[in-house]
UniProtKB/Swiss-Prot annotation:
Disulfide bonds join 34-93, 45-72, 56-85, 70-87. It comes from Arabidopsis thaliana. This is Putative defensin-like protein 252. InterPro entries: SCRL. The keyword Ribosomal protein does not apply. Residues 1-27 form the signal peptide. One of its GO terms (biological process) is defense response to fungus. It comes from the Eukaryota. Belongs to the DEFL family. Keywords: Antimicrobial, Disulfide bond, Fungicide, Plant defense, Secreted, Signal. It is found in: Secreted.
Amino acid sequence: MRCVTSFVVLCILMFLVVNNVKVDVKAQRRKPVCKLTGVLNPGKCPTAIHDASNLCSRKLASPNMTFKRCDCQNTEWRGKDHYQCTCYIKLPCNQ
């Protein structure tokens, strides 16, 4: 009887340890992102990634923000081509 009880307690402890480690790993993978999304602009994104990033940086530029990265996404709205910029701000976000 003691052997069965010890086995059950060991299984419960192992479950708790494995579950706790799994939660900690997920928390480390998720990093806070501060992103700023612009409005739809008529036209298309440039084909070169560097040109698209520069275009979006200029569109969303402000004197008190520096962007770590900008992405340009082509969309279609009301049958016409548009693009939308998303820029990621360097941490901390409130500066």
